[in-house]
C-alpha cells in the first residue's frame, strides 16, 4: 500500500536492524484517515472470504482492526494481555511471546465473543516472528472457529513470521512488507502501486 509505505518512510523511525517505531501514526498516536484507507485495503482483499468477526491483540492492532470491522460490517474483539477482574469465567487463552517487549503474556478472550463456526480475520499492526499471530490462531481454534486469514499492516519480511504462517496453511495479506531495516531506513520487498 503506497500511502502506508510513504508514511513509514516519512514518519517511521528505524531504531535498529530489527525495530521500526511507527507510534506517530499507528500504535500510539493514530492517523484515522490512514486507518480508514488500511481498512479499505483489507476489506478489498478479504471481501469474498466470508468474514464474520475480526480478532486482534491489544493494543497496536485495535485501530486497524476496528476500522476493518466497520468496513466489513462485522464485530471486532481484541485479546487482552492482562486478565481483569471482569474477565474471570468462560475464557480461552494462549501464551504469546512479544519480540518488542521481550516477554511472554497470556492472551485472553471471553468465549462469548469468539464462537464456533465463525470465520475470523486476524488483524495486527506488525508481523515479525509470528508469535502473536499463532497465539491468536490458537484462540480461534480453541473456540471451534476458523481462521480466514491474517491482515498485517507492516510485515518484517526479514523475520520468519510470514513463512511460518504460510507453512501452516494460512492466508497472509500484508500492506507493507519490509525487506530490511538499515542505516535509518526501511527498504520494502516490492514497490507497490496501490
Curated annotation (Swiss-Prot):
5-phospho-alpha-D-ribose 1-diphosphate binds at residues 128-132. Its main location: cytoplasm. It is found in: Cytoplasm. Pfam families: Pribosyltran. The keyword Cytoplasm applies. It catalyses: XMP + diphosphate = xanthine + 5-phospho-alpha-D-ribose 1-diphosphate. One of its GO terms (cellular component) is cytoplasm. One of its GO terms (biological process) is purine ribonucleoside salvage. Pathway: Purine metabolism; XMP biosynthesis via salvage pathway; XMP from xanthine: step 1/1. Its EC number is 2.4.2.22. It comes from the Bacteria. One of its GO terms (molecular function) is xanthine phosphoribosyltransferase activity. Xanthine binds at residues 20, 27, 156. Keywords: Cytoplasm, Glycosyltransferase, Purine salvage, Transferase. Homodimer. Converts the preformed base xanthine, a product of nucleic acid breakdown, to xanthosine 5'-monophosphate (XMP), so it can be reused for RNA or DNA synthesis. Belongs to the purine/pyrimidine phosphoribosyltransferase family. Xpt subfamily. PANTHER family: HYPOXANTHINE/GUANINE PHOSPHORIBOSYLTRANSFERASE, XANTHINE PHOSPHORIBOSYLTRANSFERASE. This is Xanthine phosphoribosyltransferase. The lineage of its organism: Bacteria, Bacillati, Bacillota, Bacilli, Bacillales. The gene is xpt.
